[in-house]
Regions:
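Juxta-kinase regulatory segment immediately upstream of eukaryotic protein kinase catalytic domains
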Residues: 1-19
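Generic structural marker for isolated residues within well-ordered, non-membrane alpha-helices
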Residues: 5-6, 62, 178
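Alpha-helical structural context
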Residues: 11-12, 68, 184
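Short beta-strand or tight-loop elements
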Residues: 16, 27, 72, 190-192
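ATP-binding pocket architecture of kinase catalytic cores
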Residues: 21-146, 150
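Active-site acidic catalytic loop and adjacent metal/ATP-binding pocket
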Residues: 30-35, 76, 172-195
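Residues at helix-coil transition
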Residues: 117-120, 158, 186
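Active-site catalytic-loop/activation-segment of kinase and kinase-like phosphoryl-transfer enzymes
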Residues: 131-182
Length: 195
């Protein structure tokens, strides 16, 4: 972890850093297990080139998921948006890996069902966020089909076409799909709390 990030994390947590260990598994951010001088262990994500809104909106999303008290969601301990020349980072409680219990899949299923059933204010969210490094519009829509079509599928198709990754015919093909989406997805469900 870069020295300026270590200093900023230590200042945000009120404790010096004793050690850092880079973790693997992600492709967008750098991830570290960090032991503090006060013996706490935390998880730190960094990304020097990230959009300044990326980590703050992730922190908002994690807090929103936590309010349902349905599944274990890491608590946000500190966040920096890279303003004022401070490095961008997100500090979460460290959850130690363990072998799953024999009924883990069942417990996870029940927890996710409880999370989804805890509801949401509508089909959308009160703030925009990111899918990877791509900005994601979460403005409310009248139905789930409209939200999924207009806020998820359409922007990704447009981006793929604009970047030359997909042929321009996709615009028309997916446009046709989006007009039929309400019929394809079936009966309307109430808004759910999704990650």
């Amino acid at each position: 972890m870069q020295v300026d990030t270590q200093r900023a994390v230590a200042q945000a947590l009120g404790s010096s850093i004793a050690s850092t260990h880079q973790l693997t598994g992600g492709s967008i951010n750098n991830a570290f297990a960090v032991r503090l001088d006060d013996q706490r262990e935390v998880f730190v994500k960094t990304n020097p080139g990230s959009d300044p809104r990326m980590f703050p909106t992730e922190a908002l999303g994690l807090a929103w998921l936590n309010t349902a008290e349905a599944i274990r969601v890491p608590k946000v301990l500190a966040v920096s948006d890279s303003s004022n020349s401070s490095p961008a980072f997100l500090v979460l409680e460290f959850i130690t890996s363990a072998s799953p219990a024999s009924d883990f899949a069942e417990q996870l299923g029940h927890g996710l069902a409880k999370l989804h059933a805890s509801g949401a204010d509508g089909y959308g969210l009160d703030h925009d966020n990111f899918i990877g490094t791509l900005a994601q519009d979460n403005a409310m829509c009248a139905t789930w089909a409209e939200f999924y079509g207009v806020r998820r599928i359409e922007p990704q198709v447009r981006l793929a076409v604009d970047r030359g990754i997909a042929p321009t015919t996709w615009t028309q093909t997916f446009g046709s799909l989006l007009t039929r989406l309400p019929d394809l997805v079936g009966s309307e469900e109430p808004p759910a709390r999704l990650h």
